[in-house]
Amino acid sequence: MEFFTLEYESVGCFHDKSNRAISGGSVDYHTDLIKSCYLKAKREGNEYFAVQDQRQCFTSPSAGKTYSKYGTASGCANGKGGSWKSNVYRITTGILFIFQYQTIAGGRYIVL
């Protein structure tokens, strides 16, 4: 179970190429793309993340230095990028708690 506040800001829309501006590979999310990508970046301790083509998520420790290597773009749709276009976000603040319940003697306890 997770409790979190979403704290991020849009940096803008940027071009991308097959030699990705943000290294580390991508993960596809088909629901809650921006939230899912934010959580992935937060869990990995990264400050920047990008979403592309309505389903792809990119994040890496060096993303803040590399996201703009191919220049700014227009045509990112609904904050979720486009074909070879990334909407880039920067995590500003936020707290992420991940915990699990354990059942002990019929009671539930939170394990942090």
Predicted regions and their residues:
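Peripheral, non-catalytic regulatory segments
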Residues: 1-112
